C-alpha cells in the first residue's frame, strides 16, 4: 500500500518523502521512483518514538520547505493470538505502531500544516476497524485500527475550519 501510494503521488507531480523503520527499504523504494524520473527523499523513522517523528519532520521541512500531504501507512498485525493468551508486549507493540505512531505523526505534521494554512492527512486504517475478521484472532489489531478511525474523525472535526483535511481509508485484509 505504501509504495503504491508513493508512486501514485509522485506520478501526480508530488515530491515524495518515504519513511520506513528499515532505512534500506526506504532507499530502495526511493530509487524505484527515481528510476522513473521522480524526486524525493528517504528517511529512517520509528513512528513509535515521538522525538524521532519530530526530528524527521524537521529534516523534511529543512530539505523540502513544507509538507502538504501526509499518508500514515505504518502498521503491523500479529494474528492468531487469542485474546486470553496475548501477552502485554504483543498488545502494546501493535497499539504503539498502529495507533500511537499515527497520532505522533498527525500531531507533528498537522501542527505545521495548521501553521502553513492547510494540508491533507490520510490515515491508513482497515476494514478491521468495523468488522471482526474471524478466524484471525487479532483483538489488538482490530482495536488499534478502530481507534485510528475514531482519531481520524476527531482530528478532522478539530482541524477542518483551519483547512487541514484528515481522512482515513479502510483497505481490505491483506
Give the residues covered by each predicted segment.
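The beta1-alpha1 cofactor-binding region of Rossmann-like NAD(H)/NADP(H)-dependent oxidoreductases
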Residues: 23-24, 44-56, 88
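Canonical Rossmann dinucleotide-binding motif of NAD(H)/NADP(H)-dependent dehydrogenases/reductases
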Residues: 1-17
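A glycine-rich helix->loop->beta "capping" turn
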Residues: 36-39, 59-70, 79, 90, ...
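Residue(s) in the substrate-gating loop at a strand-loop-helix junction
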Residues: 126
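Alpha-helical segment proximal to the catalytic Tyr-Lys
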Residues: 111, 157-161
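Active-site helix of classical SDR
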Residues: 106, 144, 152
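Substrate-binding pocket helix/loop in short-chain dehydrogenase/reductase
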Residues: 81-83, 87-95
